[in-house]
């Protein structure tokens, strides 16, 4: 798993605050030859709203769905120049790295914004992939042989919630925290 924080905003008199954490999750199966046999990419975007007093406004009992779980409800397809949802683009990237080694994955041409620049990938992926390339590299580095074989189905599941988040009080800061397992 990789974590990167993004888009958090302070609460003001005119607008609620936002504590946002983006969690990237990647699983790979890698052969003894270093070739990626399978890859699954997912991301969880947890968003918790709070007011100027530090009281959390979001329902902390809800499970936070991943972008793959959201599918079309994530809404990227409506704004994507190629009309593809996040989960479709992530699957295209995962499919693209199958059969490649990590040096080949790290060699994927990307722009300064982390978006793919090669015609073979831009037809199906226009979102920023720099962080996903790093996550694939990290997943491969952490992979250990547990008996999987080429052709086995790789599945990635997560459960994410913010149940341990707390409101701010006069004595202590609040905590907006997502837990993914």
Predicted regions and their residues:
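Active-site- and interface-proximal helix/loop "cap" or "latch" segments in soluble metabolic
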Residues: 4-181
């Amino acid at each position: 798993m990789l974590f990167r924080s993004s888009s958090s905003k302070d609460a003001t008199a005119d607008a609620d605050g936002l504590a946002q954490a983006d969690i990237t999750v990647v699983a790979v199966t890698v052969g003894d030859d270093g070739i990626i046999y399978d890859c699954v990419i997912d991301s969880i975007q947890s968003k918790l709203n709070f007011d100027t007093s530090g009281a959390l406004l979001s329902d902390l009992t809800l499970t936070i769905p991943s972008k793959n779980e959201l599918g079309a409800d994530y809404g990227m397809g409506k704004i994507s120049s190629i009309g593809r949802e996040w989960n479709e683009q992530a699957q295209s990237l995962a499919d693209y790295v199958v059969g490649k080694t990590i040096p080949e994955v790290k060699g994927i041409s990307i722009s300064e914004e982390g978006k793919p620049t090669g015609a073979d990938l831009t037809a199906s992926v226009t979102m920023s992939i720099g962080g996903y390339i790093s996550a694939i590299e990290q997943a491969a580095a952490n992979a250990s042989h547990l008996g999987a074989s080429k052709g086995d189905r790789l599945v990635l599941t997560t459960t994410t919630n913010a149940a341990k988040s707390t409101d701010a009080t006069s004595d202590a800061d609040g905590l907006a925290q997502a837990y993914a397992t």
